[in-house]
Design a protein with these regions (language model features):
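Structured loop/turn residues at beta-strand edges in well-structured enzyme cores
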Residues: 37, 123, 139
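Conserved SAM-binding loop
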Residues: 44, 65, 146
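Internal catalytic-core helix/loop-beta-alpha segment
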Residues: 102-105, 123, 127-129
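Short, glycine/charged-enriched secondary-structure capping and boundary segments
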Residues: 58-59, 78-80, 120-123, 143-145, ...
Length: 203
């Protein structure tokens, strides 16, 4: 049997985190990952599936996806209020591909690819998401990130993934802005993904 879950071993000192759920290690990871792929802003999430869900939420559209793809993609598209259309396309395997085009921006699925400055190949208003599932180039304890040069879009993802609350380092300073979701990346996820990101160039 092929061992797909081949991760580096780490000992995580939970006492070193300033917050177990959304500590400064998450922000540190977001910054380093954005610097690596050439994007200005990023929001780390508990999974790439949640990035698909939030990016397509209530768009009321039909999204074309390859027939050879994990079911979580179709699930997220459907659960976000859209329809799925399947196409016989295998060119996406091992690379990134356009998940959907809107009038003024596109969504790029790059769960299979992480390379330096790759976001610069696209428009500043585009959204690109990555997966940190254990089998991915930057494997981790699951997790994902969505990046863009469009700060307003990323700020919305940050609020939506943190229960719909305005972002603040201090819990009591946050205010509920709209009904959101608990989809943020936690500190342990960020720690493992960050260590493996720093090893990516050695692969």
């Amino acid at each position: 049997m092929i061992n797909l879950f081949n991760l580096n071993s780490y000992t995580i000192d939970l006492g070193s985190f300033d917050h177990h759920l959304h500590g400064s290690i998450v922000t540190e990871f977001e910054k380093e990952f954005c610097d690596y792929v050439g994007a200005k802003h990023g929001c780390a999430l508990s999974s790439a599936t949640n990035a698909i869900f939030l990016s397509l939420l209530n768009k009321d559209t039909t999204v074309d996806i390859p027939t050879l793809i994990p079911p979580v993609v179709a699930n997220a598209i459907t659960n976000s209020g859209n329809k799925v259309s399947f196409t016989d396309n295998t060119f996406w395997v091992g690379s990134s591909y356009y998940l959907h085009h809107f009038e003024d921006y596109s969504i790029i699925d790059s769960a299979q690819r992480v390379s330096r400055n790759q976001f610069k190949e696209h428009s500043p208003h585009d959204l690109m998401f990555f997966s940190f599932y254990p089998t991915k180039p930057v494997g981790g304890i699951d997790g994902g990130i969505i990046v863009s040069d469009d700060e307003d879009k990323i700020n919305w993802f940050r609020e939506a993934s943190m229960n719909g609350m305005s972002y603040s380092l201090h819990n009591w300073d946050r205010e509920l802005k709209f009904p959101g979701w608990k989809m943020y990346m936690n500190s342990a996820q960020a720690y493992v993904a960050l260590q493996n990101l720093r090893k990516l160039d050695e692969k």
